[in-house]
């Protein structure tokens, strides 16, 4: 559903959602003479496709920027620790990074223990298959885990627009006092 009616309806829902803290609150919010849930049902008849809100993402930060990828299939939000001249461009660039590189966490502290253990085990299995001595596996696996964090955590990823600096370094080059506080990525499959 990409017709003008749907796009306008989606934009109006976004304006309501920005003041909500949960999907339940959004669905029960007033929309014209009914609530959002009822409006979704009504619009299903108007647009001709079933409409539902599949997810609701919230970031509490001093500044939140966004990016909608071409084709409207990926949307990202990025929270910054402060608002300043240039925060809109910075947050959009980082949100584009999130859309393109799909990081699993902000930093290595955000990576679950299960994923870390799985990555270490995968690394050890690869090393065993290569015939590496068992005594060396732990140290080599730690190095592979560092590489995994560099590729999979947002602040450690290579910044896609220059591929020279990390996302962290890019943020600091724009504003020394700014930090990325959170990000969300939603994709239609």
Tell where the protein language model's regions lie, with residue ranges.
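N-terminal assembly/interaction segments in proteins that build large macromolecular machines
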Residues: 1-189
